[in-house]
Amino acid sequence: MCPDQEIQTEEVSARFEEGKNQTIIDRKRGLLWLKYDTWQLSGKWLNWVQSREFSEELNQQKFGGYSDWRLPTVSEAKSLFDKKQQNKDHMGQTISHAAIFEPGFGFLCWTSDVRNKIQAVRFGFRKGLQIFDDIYRTSRGSTRLVRDIEKNDGLL
């Protein structure tokens, strides 16, 4: 391992940590991510509306011990895009995404950012681009749910 790779690995391991109950702790941003995206958890593609409903279902179940899972903002989703790291999407393609997350996720991630009540932003992990898409479009729709870490969680 070259010195640059060692530094990058240390930065990543300082930022992310495996949490309990299928979660990943993001120390840099104060977030708790689900290790699996909605495609991996449900086995089906979801549009934006269904993604929000899915988060509500997990909240009712207190998935991972929490009831405040939500769609990420564009900024939060984009923060997982990292050209220094590699992971595999659902098609087995190598993408620039934090490697601590379980491989096999959807490469397009719905976010909470909306426009005109009919479009939402999807962040693409293959090229690191964001696009507006119809909130009812299901094509390869998935998201990685997230929550803010609270002081009383004892995770930071």
Regions found by a protein language model. Name each.
Residues M1-R70, S75-L156:
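Glycine-aromatic-enriched surface loops/turns that form tight recognition elements
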